[in-house]
Amino acid sequence: WVIGKGLEKVRDEFDDDDIHVIGFVDSLSEYYSYADMVIAPLTDGGGMKIKTAEAISYGKMFLGSSESLYGYWEEIPDDLKGKVVFKCDTAEEYLNAFNKIDEKPICKKNEELITLYDRLYSENAAYNIMKDIVEKTTGVKL
């Protein structure tokens, strides 16, 4: 499946037996459960990307540009870089990533990525960060 706002405009051009262009959807959760990987070739935007965090939360293999991995790449364990999470900024880098992925079976749910998400990006992680800030600035234990 190829999902993303505006892609329904090119559905006829790319849709075939192996590629299903969906376009915009209200919720990605259904698609994450079936997806082998998430590809996010973003070229501009500001700040950390929610879709990247969402893909990591599902433990999905991720291919993304420097832009889509902004704020995440540094936290990805080195042993997952180039194996489960790929930084690709050129067509050649995406092709190299696909060739590397083709060498072994795809893990549809990487537990290390899910743990990383839980530790750094989840609602609970945000709560703990804010709690720590409040406790350190006020001296009050929550």
Stretches found by the model and what they are:
Residues 82-107, 138:
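C-terminal "capping" alpha-helix adjacent to the active site of nucleotide-linked donor transferases
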Residues 1-5, 62-65:
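Short, hydrophobic beta-strand segments that form beta-sheet elements in well-ordered domains
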Residues 4-30, 80-84:
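Nucleotide-activated donor-binding/catalytic signature segment of Leloir-type glycosyltransferases, i.e.
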Residues 27, 44-47, 69:
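Active-site donor-sugar recognition loop in glycosyltransferases
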Residues 51-54, 61-68:
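Short hydrophobic beta-strand element within catalytic cores of glycosyltransferases
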Residues 66-82:
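Short acidic/histidine- and often glycine-rich active-site loop of Leloir-type glycosyltransferases
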Residues 33-47, 58-60:
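Acidic donor-binding loop of glycosyltransferase active sites
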